[in-house]
Design a protein with these regions (language model features):
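Short loop/turn segments at strand-loop or loop-helix junctions that form parts
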Residues: 56-57, 78, 107-111
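A short beta-strand submotif of the Rossmann-like class I SAM-dependent methyltransferase core
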Residues: 74-80
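Conserved N-terminal segment of class I S-adenosyl-L-methionine
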Residues: 1-70, 74, 89-91, 123-126, ...
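S-adenosyl-L-methionine-dependent methyltransferase catalytic module, highlighting the catalytic core
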Residues: 14-15, 26, 30-31, 85-163
Length: 163
């Protein structure tokens, strides 16, 4: 088993390889159906199966703050919000693109992983706490909100909310 060390803590090497979404797909496939978006997969081959890809590396007019002017059944996003200066604004915008009953499925780096904190990783501008994400969805009147408090082997957590 390969591991990496960062600031005296040992982590599984898989956390340094990218493509975190693969660990969320088995759960997401049980929940997400219909027409959807994958926001921020970084590569086409890393996108949620069947979803329309929204990413700055895709040459089109869309990004996390400028989505197609249509409604979707779900939005999947893995390890994207921590890269955005205004994650609240992004989620507010994403919510406007969901059908009634639509689902936002987030897979996010857990704050306990030292390397993913913004002061240790220049690509991350936020460290998102599970309770903050849960509070956001609850305050925005999502009907069903599920957020894991702990982390998985990829040191990530899930947040799933339905309008």
């Amino acid at each position: 088993m390969k591991t990496i060390e960062f600031e005296g803590k040992e982590y599984l090497e898989l956390q340094s390889k990218g493509y975190a979404a693969q660990y969320a797909f088995p759960f997401a496939k049980q929940i997400l159906t219909g027409k959807g978006l994958d926001i921020g997969p970084n590569r086409k081959e890393w996108a949620f199966p069947g979803a329309r890809i929204i990413d700055i590396v895709i040459p089109d007019n869309y990004d996390a703050f400028n989505l197609p002017d249509e409604k979707f059944d779900y939005i999947f996003s893995s390890h994207c919000l921590e890269h955005l200066n205004d994650w609240v604004g992004a989620l507010n915008h994403w919510s406007t693109r969901l059908n009634n009953g639509g689902i936002i499925f987030l897979y996010l780096p857990h704050p306990d992983q030292m390397y993913w904190r913004p002061w240790n990783n220049r690509h991350h501008v936020n460290i998102l706490e599970p309770n903050h994400i849960e509070d956001y969805f609850t305050c925005k009147k999502f009907n069903k909100v599920f957020v894991t408090k702990g982390y998985d082997l990829n040191h990530s957590f899930y947040a799933i909310a339905q309008l």
